[in-house]
């Protein structure tokens, strides 16, 4: 694989797009960065969009609904597109995302830097080398609340994306239980895989930033401890997307998240 230095178009406003720009610039991964607010991008005409995206990798960092409208706007183009978490807040948005992915010429990839981190590579090797039943507790969240979604949605994809590499979409023994707590500000997810894992995930509102995996009652990973790793996961992910052999398989990437969103939809209408 060969990394191709890219021109980057960032769609979105706020601290996270600014941080993305800072990270990729610090490692000299892009020759040019253009940033535009999502609302301004959605006002552009077809020719303006084509000119703006020409020869660029696209990174969309906005709300799920805005993200879907942008994807609809660019569906006729052929760009690599990084989309941000959360990918959807309900089953309708998820279905629209999958439909777009199937009909679009763009290559979509969900932004999941931890998949490309050294700490996760080592952790995954340890987990897959352990024989026998494993009990895993995951706590992830923080004090931030957004006006357009409840806190669990902010954090859901982080761990489900990683777990999707440990669990198998073809494992018919997988069982899911989901329960909203604290007036929707927290979410408990239980995933059981016969003879392999019992996983309890606690997401949402915490007094302070919390990103811990606890294996058999012992701290296994603390993603919040930035001193415990030396690599740059965001840069690693960007290089992965920008390499000349990059291929996209969005639905496989988010299969576990799709299962949970479907389960939550069942609960809502039960």
Positions of predicted regions on the chain:
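Short amphipathic alpha-helix with an adjacent loop that forms part of the alpha/beta core around
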Residues: 44-54, 125
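NAD(P)-dinucleotide binding in Rossmann-like oxidoreductases
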Residues: 179-185, 190-251
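Rossmann-like dinucleotide-binding domain that binds NAD(P)(H)
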Residues: 142-207
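Catalytic nucleophile loop
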Residues: 17, 67, 159
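N-terminal Rossmann-like dinucleotide-binding module
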Residues: 1-43, 52, 270
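A contiguous active-site-proximal alpha/beta segment in oxidoreductase catalytic domains
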Residues: 88-144
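Beta-strand-loop-alpha-helix segment that lines the small-molecule cofactor/substrate pocket
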Residues: 57-64, 68-112
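C-terminal helix-rich "cap/oligomerization" subdomain common to oxidoreductases
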Residues: 1-2, 8-11, 41-44, 55-62, ...
């Amino acid at each position: 694989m060969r990394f191709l230095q890219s021109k980057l178009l960032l769609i979105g406003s706020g601290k996270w797009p600014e941080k993305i720009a800072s990270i990729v610039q610090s490692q000299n991964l892009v020759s040019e960065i253009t940033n535009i607010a999502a609302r301004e991008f959605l006002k552009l005409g077809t020719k303006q969009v084509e000119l703006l995206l020409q020869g660029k990798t696209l990174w969309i960092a906005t709300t799920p609904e805005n993200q879907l409208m942008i994807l609809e706007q660019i569906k006729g183009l052929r760009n690599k597109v990084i989309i941000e978490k959360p990918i959807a807040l309900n089953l309708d948005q998820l279905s629209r995302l999958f439909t777009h992915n199937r009909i679009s010429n763009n290559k979509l990839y969900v932004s999941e830097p931890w998949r490309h981190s050294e700490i996760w590579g080592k952790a995954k090797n340890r987990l897959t080398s352990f024989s026998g039943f494993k009990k895993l507790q995951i706590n992830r969240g923080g004090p931030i609340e957004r006006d357009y979604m409840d806190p669990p949605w902010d954090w859901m994809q982080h761990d489900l994306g990683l777990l999707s590499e440990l669990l198998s979409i073809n494992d018919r023994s997988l069982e899911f239980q989901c329960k909203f707590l604290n007036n929707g500000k927290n979410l408990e997810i239980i995933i059981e895989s016969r003879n392999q894992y019992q996983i309890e995930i606690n997401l949402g509102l915490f007094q302070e930033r919390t990103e811990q995996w606890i294996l058999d009652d012992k701290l296994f990973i603390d993603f919040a401890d930035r001193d415990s790793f030396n690599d740059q996961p965001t840069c690693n992910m960007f290089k992965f997307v920008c390499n000349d052999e990059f291929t996209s398989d969005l639905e496989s990437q988010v299969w576990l998240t799709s299962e949970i969103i479907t389960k939550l939809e069942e609960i809502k209408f039960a």
